[in-house]
Amino acid sequence: MRVLTLNAGSSSLKAAVFEIQSVPQSGGAPCGQVWTADSRGDAGLVGDLLAPVLPDGIDLEYKTSPPIEVVGHRIVHGGTQLSDAVRITPSILDEIARVSEHAPAHNALALDVIRRTIALFGDDVPHVAVFDTAFHRTLEPAAFTYAGPLDWVADGIRRFGFHGINHEYVSGRAIALRDRPAESSRIVTCHLGSGCSLAAVHDGRSVDTTMGFTPMDGLPMARRSGAVDPGILLHLLRRGSHTIDSLDQVLNEQSGLAGLSGTTGDMRVVLDGMDAGDPRCRLAFDVFAHHVRKGIAAMAASMGGLDILVFTGGVGEHIPRVRSAICASLGFLGVAISPDRNLSAAGESELSDASSAAGVFVIPAEENWMIAQACVRVVSSSVR
């Protein structure tokens, strides 16, 4: 089956084409990729993002010989109604649009991409939505319920969690690399990129995570604040220094590493500033590392311990200094990494040294591969 996957971020679009012969097994390494492309730009200019990814030539090379048989789309927020990969229909599109207010930078772009690709490929090619929130559908009420009025839950206000496509992938790969059964594995996955989240994966199921009702919650990120005392927001509103819209802009675009350091929020720029003696960059780095360490400990507490720690995402995969700073104080969880392994890590790599009770790994994100697998499962089940 030839699958086209489209992974729309807030200002980027990644695409890949896979040839998959059968329904893949969980935890398997990516295979069958025959083409890939990505683009970045203004989130409002979807045509500009699509042009490099879906050039006119795709009609000749990938739509006709052999044809694309299914198109898969990453959707960040599925709300309470969309908790598994599903074939896209008009009613599914309506539901994705309904919950877009909770992830407007992501869902709105994905919807536009879906509509444009349906127009490109026509009605005969099925489209499948794969949700970042789906992996976290196994959270228990104690983990997903906010301690506000109970009717919040009835209104759909709860912890959803995000980055689930990648948390599911890297936890499955970690089990395979560690060569132990999922049923006895307590894994903390650290997705550290421009957006950051942790997940506790016990027995192959997500049992806790740091992002919440929206992707703004949890860890400090490149430009997002992560969790803040809600009293701060009430204080700023009462003082009249901010409106709801201006607070939205501050929390989503002017906070996190960018807000603390005065930079773009790129971790590499923060590290350069720190090395040059900039105290703001030092503070930004220390705040980030502190919250990630604290979050890892909290995730481990949700499972009663830690067997495997995984770093993934752009920062988690490519910046050894971040991994070293995070792991330095996690000895109480049985974490010890080899400095040499940490510095030389490339692709899937084990960082843990011989004294480490917990396995520590770097595992590159492979969201497109997970989307392709979900497409095959959805389409295969619909033709039985």
Regions found by a protein language model. Name each.
Residues 137-237:
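Glycine-rich phosphate-binding loop of actin/hexokinase-like ATP-binding domains
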Residues 348-384:
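Structural signal for terminal/edge beta-strands and the immediately following C-terminal loop/tail
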